[in-house]
Amino acid sequence: MRERWREAPDEVTLPCKKLLCLSLLLALCLLLTGCHGSQDTSEFVIPASFDTTRDYEITFWAKNDTNKTQTAVYEQAIQDFETLYPNIHVNMRLYTDYSRIYNDVVTNIATGTTPNVCITYPDHIATYLTGNHVIAPLDDLFANARYGLGGSELKFDGSALDEIVPQFLQECRIGAHYYALPYMRSTEALYVNKTMVEQLGYTLPDSPTWDFIWEVSDEATAKDEEGNYLVNGQKTMIPFIYKSTDNMMIQMLRQKDAPYSTSAGEIQIFNDVTREMLFTVRDHVATGAFSTFKISSYPGNFLNAGQCIFAVDSTAGASWMGTKAPHMDIAADQVRDFELAVRPIPQFDPAHPAMISQGPSVCVFNKPDAQEVLASWLFTQFLLTDSVQTGYAETEGYVPVTLKAQQSEAYQDYLSRKGEDNDEHYSVKIDAAELLMNNTANTFVTPVFNGSASLRDAAGQLIEETAKAVRRKKTVDDAFIDSLYSQVNSLYRLDQIGGQTGSIEDAKANLGPLPGTAVALLCALIAAWVLMGLYLLRRKLKEKKHK
């Protein structure tokens, strides 16, 4: 019996080892699962002084639309900044799409490898903020006497807080804090083939209404017996093309004072006014008067080819519009000569205009090293200096975000030379910039919250799906709209973000229950350790008994 008992441990050792291996494996899985989430960083605290004895290497992610002039502005800004701060080295990574920047940032948050400074949008920042201390709040940095806006220790002529256009700065406030600085601002403009409007017997108003646009567009669909459009003598004519249908829906709702969302994240877009707008889209897609960029391609190409009368696009795309545009995506022999006019986007009530404010902002990512964050903040501020602001704004129909740069002698000289050439001083580009400066008080932005970027995409999807359905000969009625609302709500998971209350900080604290897989993993791990404990206890009791 004694001999048999001595062999027993060998018989049970294997299960014990298996159990131990299983426990370690489960623990490893749990560790890896934890690593997949965002890496927490301590809250940023401003250092008392900037340590100039150290070298810093910071990364800057930017967007340039493949515009070499914009790239040159960035490169010159980095060179000038590094001359002032030789211990700070800036590595720039260029993107051609804001969504790719957004996706890469989200991916890198999980691994703690975000850039230091990033060109972005407030909607995107709201998502970044779901991680703990991922973005550095800028309120205290703004006010810091030494290194803040217009601070005494800056080695450049920085802008003070009251020198930033208030409307543009307010767009960078999310919840109770500022998380970005505005970098450039634009809006949307209506680019018009004025020659064709007058050819159809109409006079182009200073502020066209939606009714005017629809009426002229429907009129332009008339064809001759051979199928050529009467207005241009060609086989192709899309009178009205809108590039960004999310902006189209958002601005229509704002002009109608209709609900879109609350600042707390309550989704309100699925309403009767939206339904009315979609039926309007239905009617004019059916006549061939209206299409979108996603369906038909870039509106500027059709406009320049004499195949479009009204093209809505960003003022930041003005250098692609018109017969003499410095940038073209079509062959020279396709371009038609016409007079181009720049107008505000269509309005329901021109006496009370509303147009969206858009354009990139700059955020600073938090890091374990507060000195590194301060170095990043210094570079971010440098992007608001006059030379950078005017240099970049002049590449397109952008507007500098500081009153200081707007009123500078260099920028005023640039505006005064409108039409002097068809490159740097291209008249359409400067007209577009002046449109925004003259309407800054009429601009607005949508509420920002975690999920607001998805809501924006959903707004455009409603128009896109309605237009596609008409082109596919589907019946677009109330039943269709009801189904569309449900599909879009599900596709963009709006039902999962609707009705949130409180600040983003509150939302992070209220994360809800653990996912089922996490619960199962934790339970399995606990069970494994319990079994190991029971086995060891049993073995100990046996040893005691046989002693």
PLM region descriptions:
Residues 89, 283-290, 326-404:
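Extracytoplasmic/periplasmic substrate-recognition and gating elements
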Residues 55-60, 64-126:
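Early extracytoplasmic/lumenal segment of secretory-pathway proteins
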Residues 1-58, 493-547:
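Short, low-complexity disordered leader/linker segments with a strong preference
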Residues 170-183, 188, 212-267:
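Extracytoplasmic/periplasmic solute-binding protein
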Residues 427-547:
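Conserved C-terminal helix/tail region of periplasmic/extracytoplasmic solute-binding proteins
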Residues 340-347, 393-467:
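Long, aromatic- and glycine/proline-rich binding clefts that accommodate carbohydrate-like moieties
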